[in-house]
Amino acid sequence: MLPYVIATLGSAGSTCKASTCSNSTKDYCYSARIRSTVLQGLPFGGVPTVLALDFMCFLALLFVFSILRKVAWDYGRLALVTDADSIASALHSDNHDRYERLTSVSSSVDFDQRDNGFCSWLTAIFRIKDDEIRDKCGGDAVHYLSFQRHIIGLLVAVGVLSVGIVLPVNFSGDLLENNAYSFGRTTIANLNSGNNLLWLHTSFAFLYLLLTVYSMRRHTSKMRYKEDDLVKRTLFINGISKYAEPEKIKKHFEEAYANCTVLEARPCYDVARLMFLDAERRKAERGRIYFTNLQSKENTPSMINPKPCGHLCCCVIRGCEEVEAIEYYTKLEEKLKDDYKREKEKVNEKPLGMAFVTFHNETITAIILKDFNACKCQGCACRGEPRASSCSESLHVSNWTVSYAPDPQNIYWEHLSIRGFIWWIRCLVINVVLFILLFFLTTPAIIITTMDKFNVTKPVEYLNNPIITQFFPTLLLWCFSALLPTIVYYSAFFEAHWTRSGENRTTMHKCYTFLIFMVLLLPSLGLSSLDVFFRWLFDKKFLAEAAVRFECVFLPDNGAFFVNYVIASAFIGNAMDLLRIPGLLMYMIRLCLARSAAERRNVKRHQAYEFQFGAAYAWMMCVFTVVMTYSITCPIIVPFGLMYMLLKHLVDRYNLYYAYLPAKLDKKIHSGAVNQVVAAPILCLFWLLFFSTMRTGFLAPTSMFTFVVLVITIVICLCHVCFGHFKYLSAHNYKIEHTEVDTTESRQNGRPATNLPAPKSAKYIAQVLQDSSPEGEATESEEQGSQDEELITTDGMNDTDFQSCEDSLIENEIRQ
């Protein structure tokens, strides 16, 4: 189909040999952009004006951020370590649960005295070392930042070639007007169709592909991805008989496999409601302790309105009467504690038919995994059954699905109960709703079209002003592209993935796909939404109008729109990442919904969230793809793309170190990002193929060469991604290091001791099931609450005492 369409485009486009596209073609392409999306005829595409405006906005946003950072200093300090649960965990055990749900943060987290000035945080970004980031943020953050540095190096090489060689070649053409202020003279549209210099563009596109693969291989080869020894020795088994006992699971493996020792078998249970009750119980407990201490200081009882937003009510109405705070939270705590105890007693009656099984070494784990995977049907023939034991039938071994277990900190224990048919239906409904929403609202052009129906844009129709025609449209496109990751993120969150890595990978792939359609493909083709795209693609007039559509890509001023978009992303986008406006809005909403001062303090203490690697990868790769796609047809875009990546790298270093909690993911999220990088030079080849076909026809030497290179590249990529072939040609070259666990004390006579439990922090069991017995929880909670109040009080806390205690907590919290 692709060669036929391209050949048709060539035959249709070969008739278009004029120096410029006709006015009808321009109107046809610009019509989808509603007169205010692509600049038509302004000096140098309005780039200098947009650059100046965006830079001034960037400076203003940095000033606002510095003020907010100074004013909201203590919010971030409270957010990281003052949760009572985390404090107790850090002080009393090796296990702690730092990983909560995330969106973003509303204030800066800073514990280093070296950057507590008004603008000293700017220089502190450059003084942060990778070792400090690894210790505080984890290995995934170092992986992510290394990825950015290699993209920056790639853009430096591409920028030197594009600006130093391709740009003068484009400028040497004479098809467009001989005007120093004409943006079109810098694009490939300025060259004649018979110019032999077009071979340079095709060769450089292939060179950029090779540079991209080399850069990613260098990135992956330098990153030693560390995997815990426990993870490599643990298998996750799904499909077990629901009421299978751990001893039977151990017996099966030790009978079926010689020299196999099972250290631990942990069945999984439905703990979603138990975790919810535990969280609510702790909130009520903290509220009771807060008002008890407050009453002991002020000797007056506190009254609260227990309704949501009750503290905002200025009058007392029926049904919203105030109640005594200690009495309210005491009753609520007792009720939740009773519900929690009852649910904990019933949790063993809710098995999920899953288990985590830990073995004594990696070798036997690999043998068992290979044995079960080899039994999967291939075509119509099945290659046998797994090894049997006396417990095989009762355990339903033939129904097992076996894989390596994720890291315990990577698991959403509350989501394990959502599985099978219910999970697939839930996922299907969510993604259908998401697709329908984005199907009609893919680009800002469709919004502007709706506004235009009510004559909203009529007053500015005749204004040929860069601010009207370029600044606001590109800003609008950035706003929509910023909103899209949030929508896609919440869709992935409601899908209830079992692991954080799976959630981030889904977010990354979906965000990247929709962003490429929104930002690159549809605006380039002069289409306003996916709705129009599919109607154009499957219309009977497709072949007749295809040539005109692809001419939209190579209009002289088309590249200016994307240059201005990259400028907006570099300055306004990165500045907004520093401010984290969505997180600030969410924080304000949560404060408004809080029912008392205790709950508002609890909101302040739960601002710090994990960094969203999936959304960050997707947005960054979208801008990089736009830059690489137009790096040859519009080479002036590359320096601005490099500027975006440099600012993005600095902003992410700051956010990772000061604003977000560490996240524990697997290497699949990083390898998926590497795969997406290769899509950028492939799209660049597509753009050159379309241009060559439109100008010279499909059978021209440049068109055929580009087509052959493109087909070979796509075949290699598909074979590698789908079947694992061409590993030496791939962009992956990861080296994995295993973090060995000291098992000297757990061995008896050279053989692992089966009666010694794994360290508490490494257990494959939900945190809520690792807590102490219900009888001891009340006393322990009182002690935790007392310690919490000693550490954090609203008014009477000495800053020096807080800082010293906080430093010890941070060291215990982060260094583990």
UniProtKB/Swiss-Prot annotation:
Cell location: Cell membrane; Lysosome membrane; Early endosome membrane
GO molecular function terms attached to this record: calcium-activated cation channel activity; mechanosensitive monoatomic cation channel activity; osmolarity-sensing monoatomic cation channel activity; phosphatidylcholine transfer activity; phospholipid scramblase activity; sphingomyelin transfer activity
Record topological domains on the Cytoplasmic side: 72-138, 221-420, 496-499, 593-612, 660-666, 722-816
Lipid anchor positions (S-palmitoyl cysteine): C57, C119, C375, C391, C719, C722
Processing and modification events after translation: Palmitoylation is required for localization to the plasma membrane and stability.
Residue ranges annotated as Extracellular topological domain: 1-46, 172-195, 451-465, 537-559, 632-634, 696-700
The reaction(s) this protein catalyses: Ca(2+)(in) = Ca(2+)(out); Mg(2+)(in) = Mg(2+)(out); K(+)(in) = K(+)(out); Na(+)(in) = Na(+)(out)
Membrane topology label: Multi-pass membrane protein
Assembly mode: Monomer.
Similarity annotation: Belongs to the CSC1 (TC 1.A.17) family.
Protein role: Mechanosensitive cation channel with low conductance and high activation threshold. Osmosensitive cation channel preferentially activated by hypotonic stress. Also acts as a phospholipid scramblase in response to changes in membrane structure: upon changes in membrane curvature and thickness, alters its conformation and translocates phospholipids, thereby controlling plasma membrane lipid distribution.
Protein name according to UniProt: Mechanosensitive cation channel TMEM63B
Species name: Gallus gallus
UniProt gene name: TMEM63B
